[in-house]
Amino acid sequence: AYGKSKGATINVNTMDFTRLDLDWLLEIIGRLVEAGADIVRIDDICAPCIPAVYEHHAKAVKAKIGDVPLAIHSHDDFDLATAAQLSALQGGAEILEGCINGLGERAGVPNIAVLAAICEIFYGYDTGIRLDGFQELSEFVAQVWNQPIPEHLPGNGRTAFSHAAEVHYVLPSDDQWSFNAWAPSVLGNTDKVALCHYSGPMAIKRRASDMSLGELDTATANLVLEQVRKELKLRNGPLTDQLFTELVEVAARASASGETDTERLEAWNRLLQSD
């Protein structure tokens, strides 16, 4: 009543809603709305249930509060926070919540960039958010919080749109959908070539092209691939752009000059010793 008297928008938060008796939860929420609540927010506290519960409870709460907006707050303890948000949305929730890079207590909360993208791509909503600005914002928050963006963070991670297996590169260059559900540019991210033991010459060619190292012929690409596989075993980790560039340069010289296997091996060894 005090907040309403001051003209404030009253957002009430019902915490741990999934472990409350549903009838009792609805009784509490009904009284809060009668007292003037402008927004009802249901908060799972620690995600102790499956997504279907969020939809079920959201439907029940929405039937109780009518036109009063329903918000949902979920946590990622079981890696289900985003699914919980979408289930609540399908149950009638109008306000979804997340955070940049999924930052939050314990395992975090939904990554708001992906949550917003899902709402637009799959549900057709206009969120009013400039989605392609999320990557810049993600990197800014990571810097300010001194918490690097997780490599595999959907949408914003460095490898979120990376492809390694050779089968991903044997398709026509303009085929971007056979192995992608959405374009990295939606969130301002980019796709990357991640080399691994499943990579082949087409992946080598694509990475060289992306790095402006020229268009490699198949023979040169195979020379690079041979050494890339050796390096991956030795280093037990990804190759840096610098090392890849040096491998391409050595292979290109070998192909152009017709170096023997022994000469090429000596060149590789000199490169590794200088690395």
Positions of predicted regions on the chain:
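A mid-to-C-terminal "edge-of-domain" accessory segment
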Residues: 124-275
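A generic secondary-structure micro-motif detector
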Residues: 18, 74-75, 194
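Alpha/beta enzyme core
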Residues: 1-70, 86-93
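Catalytic alpha/beta core domains of metabolic enzymes, predominantly
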Residues: 46-180
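Generic anion/oxyanion-binding catalytic loop in active/binding sites
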Residues: 14, 104, 230-233
